Amino acid sequence: MSSSKSFAYQSLLMVLCVTSPLVAFATQLEEVQGWLQKMYHAAHTLNYEGTFVYGQHGRLSSMRIIHQVTPEGEQERLISMDGTGREVIRDGGKVTCYLPDSKAVVVEKSRKLKKFPPEFPMKLDDLKNYYTFSLIGDSRVAGHITQGIEIVPKDPYRYGHQLWVEKKTGLLLKTHLLDEDNKPIEQFVFTQVSFLDQVADEKLVPAMDTKKFTWYEAKDTNDKDDKDEADFNVDWLPGGFKQDMNRMQKMPTGGMPVKHMVYSDGLSSVSVFIEEDVQHDPANLMGGSRMGAINAHGRHLGDYHVTVVGEVPQLTVEKICEAISTKNQ
């Protein structure tokens, strides 16, 4: 081989070595996005009934779920199979929690509460700057073949995820939330699931008699987001985090309105709660706290108390909490 041809050949090899991983990465990212789109579609179009186990903080809870989609929207009923048999019913944008142990019913908007199975975004254009996405092979869950997906954060401010998606329907059947050491700190897995043509109406109503229960309803004190009226600044956020919500709301059990702000990168999120605390109530959280995957950090800010909560590392909630200031500071 002549020197010129040898040089050209070596140059071509260098180009292939450099570009092949990029092509493979782009192809796999597209495959992952395809599975996430299928998963999102399944979550909002399928009728199903099943049993799943949810575990965090060393505790396991068994739940039954019934999910229905109609032209009027989605309906869902969650029944705890442990303890006192608490139930949660979702009907469109409203969530009603039935608590027989305290003889109470709490009504809230669904945007404030975590969903089961968990939801994940369909588009990865922005998220790929902060996470690595890959396929991790097939696995059998509750008798169904699933496609595994791994999501690894690129910085210490978010958790990782492993997902197992049912291949035929796209329903998410199993998840692991992974901490900074790549260890599961929260798990969700179906032990049985059946796909239905339709759901009987009686399966979507609570089994308990609530005539003697006390009803509470969380209400926003304003009808729209008050982003332009905020009196507080958040001077640091992890890359990609943007404000999703900024509202004043009344808690279900009463008391003074609380400012509630939500920040998210599309996958991870944190809530910021700010309330008046002129007397510096000793019951309010000071410093860090953890319950399973959920971390929190609280502190005083003048005549206010600030709490930051989220399924993110403790470092994240602490840095955000310490970065909150009043506009007149």
Q: What name fits each language-model region?
A:
Residues 2-5, 15, 22-74, 83, ...:
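N-terminal leader/targeting segments and the immediate start of mature chains
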Residues 45-49, 72-77, 143-150, 171-174, ...:
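Short, hydrophobic/aromatic-rich segments at coil-to-beta transitions
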Residues 60-64, 157-161, 173, 185-186, ...:
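Short, surface-exposed coil-to-beta transition loops
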Residues 62, 66-118, 177-189, 195-197:
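An acidic-aromatic
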Residues 138-211:
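Gly/Pro-enriched, hydrophobic low-complexity segments
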Residues 213-301, 314-315:
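Short, solvent-exposed recognition patches
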